[in-house]
C-alpha cells in the first residue's frame, strides 16, 4: 500500500509586523514549539506560503528571501519536510492587518506597459456594477487573460526560487503552485467584492476587455452575444440555452487552460524528482439547488454545466487542466474533507450543500484521470468538532486520498486540544 503523507500549514507569516522585537522572538519561539510537537505527532511536512507580494515587493528582479531561508531552516532542523506554495495570489485583509502580502504594485504598472491595457483590465472584472456603473474588479490574482504578459514574471520567480534553495531540494516533499485567488484554481466569484459570496450563486468574472476579446475569438464565425445579455438565463438555471452553453464552456475552458499553463511551467523549471501540486476548492453549496444546480461551481469556473454528475463534471475539467502533462508528477489538492451534506430537512437553510458527496466525486474523478489526490479541511473552526475528524478519516479510508494537510499548524498543536488528539490518532492509524 502506498504511504500517505500527513502535513500541516505554517502560519500565513511568523511574526506580526508590529515593530516589536519582543513579539517577534515570542512568535518564533512558539513556531519552534509547534514544529517539535508536529514531529512528535508524526506529521511529515509543513506547507509554507512563499508570498510573491513579500519576496519581490520592491521591484522587478529584486528578491528578498531572508524570511524563507529562516523558516525553511527551522523546519528542516526539526526533521520535517517542506511543501513550498508559490503564492502568486494576494493576501490583503486591509491596511490595519498585522500581515499583508498584496500583489506587488509594480506588477500592475509593468503589465499595463507591456500589454497596452489599463491596470483594471488586467484584473478580473465582475458582471456586477458599482455606483454610477463603476466596474467592480478583484486584484487578488492577475487575470488569466493577462497570462501572455505575466507568465514570464511567474517563471522568473520560480527560477530564482530554485536557484536560492538548490541545497534544500531534498527536503521538499512537493512544490505547490498558486493558480488563482487564495491559491486555488478558480475565479474570484465569491470573494465579496461584488456581492458574490458564500452561500449565493457567485458572480461571473469575464468582463474585462481582453476577456471579451478572447470570447469573440473563441466563437469565431458563430454569432456573438455579450455575456451580460446571458446572465438572466444563467440565473434561471437555463444552462442549455445556446448562448449560455457556449459562454460557460469557454469560461471553464479558459480557467483549465490557465491551470495547464501554470503547471507546465512548473514541470519545465523544477527537477523531475519533485512532485508539483495544485489546489481546487470544495464549492459545495448550491449543488442540489432544484432551480440552479451547481451554479456556484459554474461561476467559479470549475465545471461548465453540461454534466450535472459531479464525478463526470470534474473528470472533464481535470482532463483539460492536465492535457499533455506527466500525470505521475502532479498532485491535486482538494478542500472540504471535514464537511457534511445538508439533508432534505435542512437543505434550504444549509444552501443545498453536498460537501461529502463532492469529496468522493472529486476523488473518483482523480482516479479516473490517473493522478494522485490529497485532501484539506476548508475551515479551521470545524476542527473543534469530533464528527469533522471522523469525516476526514472516512475520506482517507474509503476515498482515493493519499494524504492530508490540515489548516493550520496551531489547530493541531496548541490551539485546539481535540485537533491535536484526533490528528495524532489518524496519523497512528494510517
Report each predicted region and the residues it spans:
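Boundary/entry segment of secreted carbohydrate-active catalytic domains
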Residues: 1-38, 49
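Structural preference for beta-strand elements that scaffold enzyme active sites
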Residues: 3-9, 45-47, 79-85, 172-176, ...
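Active-site beta-loop-alpha junctions enriched in small/polar residues
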Residues: 11-15, 51-53, 87-91, 177-182, ...
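Short, solvent-exposed loop/turn and secondary-structure capping segments
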Residues: 19-25, 58, 87, 94-99, ...
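Well-ordered, non-membrane alpha-helical segments in soluble/globular domains
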Residues: 24-34, 62-71, 148-160, 254-264, ...
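Aromatic-lined substrate-binding rim segments of carbohydrate-active enzymes
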Residues: 28-125, 152-169, 173, 193-196, ...
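Substrate-binding cleft of secreted/luminal carbohydrate-active enzymes
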Residues: 81-83, 87-91, 310-430
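Polysaccharide-binding and catalytic clefts of secreted carbohydrate-active enzymes
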Residues: 109-323
